[in-house]
Amino acid sequence: MMKKLTSLLLSAALLVGMLACGASAKTNTTVRVAGLKGPTTMGLVNLLAMEKNGTASQNYDLQLYGAADEVVPKLIKGEVDIAAIPANLAATLYQKTNGGIQVMAVNTLGVLYVVEKGDTVHSFADLKGRTILSTGKGTTPEYVLRYLLRKNGIDPDKDVKIEYYSEASEVTAQMAATKKDAIAVLPQPYVTAAQMKDSSLRVVLDLTREWNKVCDTQLITGVTVVRTAYAEEHPEEVINFLKDYQKSVDAANDDLDGTAALCEEVGVVAKAAI
C-alpha cells in the first residue's frame, strides 16, 4: 500500500505544480464534491459558508456519505468531481483506474485511537484474545490496525476478533450498549462523542504514536482527490477549488466554534460540542 500511496502523492505534486502555472478566474460551474462524515470533511465545510456569503470562487455541491464505498462508484462514473476519501482507498483507485484520479491534498493525518469501556487494556499485548469493534473495513482504519497488530506480535486473523461496522456512529452506539470491557478503534471526533455519552470510556492507545514507534513515514489517514479527466478539462475550476479549500481550512482553524456549528448543521458530526 505504501508504494501505491507514494506514487499517488508524487502525482499530486505534479498536479499542483501544473495548476500553479495557470491563472485562476471566477467560473459559473458547480463543482461536485463528495465527503465522508467525520474528520476528512471538516476542512471542506466552510466552502458552504463562503458560497453563501459570496466569497467562494465558484459554486459547490457538497454531498456527505457515511461510508467510503458509497463514494467510489460516483467517482468512477464521473458523478462527482472531487472527493475526500481514505488515503489507502485513493491509492487503490489510482491503480485500478490507471491514474484516473489524483491526490490534490492531504486532509487528515493521525486521528485513530483504541478506546476501552473498562480498565483491562494498557498496551497492544493486552488486545490478544479480545474482540475489537472498528469502522473502515477495506480502508485506512483496517490497514493501520492490522499492521500495528502484526508489528506488536499479534496475528490479526488468529489472535483477535475484529468486528467491522459501516459507520463510526454504529461503533459508538455498540460501545454504549455494552456493559463493560468493550474495545474499539475510532477516529476523532467520534472518540469525544462516545466519551460525552459514557464517561467510563477511555483512550488506551494513540495509533499515531504507535505508528511512529515502528514506522519512519507519517501516518496519512485521508486525502482529497480529483478525477484526472476533470482536472484536465476544467483547470480553472480546480485551481479555484484549491484556493477556496485553503480558505476553508484557514476559516476552520480561525473560527472553531463557527466551524463546529456548521459541521453539526450539515451532518459532518452529530453535535457541535464534539
Predicted stretch roles:
Residues 26-165, 182-188, 204-205:
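Short, glycine-/small- and polar/acidic-enriched structural segments
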Residues 70, 126, 170, 258, ...:
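An acidic, carboxylate-rich microenvironment
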Residues 1-30:
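Short, low-complexity disordered leader/linker segments with a strong preference
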Residues 12, 112, 222:
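Residue-level detector of short, conserved catalytic/binding motifs and their immediate flanks
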Residues 28-29, 39-40, 195-196, 257-274:
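An extracytoplasmic/periplasmic, membrane-proximal ligand-sensing/linker region
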Residues 88-89, 170-263:
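Pocket-lining segment of extracytoplasmic ligand-binding domains
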Residues 47-50, 74, 78, 92-96, ...:
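Structured segments of extracytoplasmic/periplasmic soluble domains
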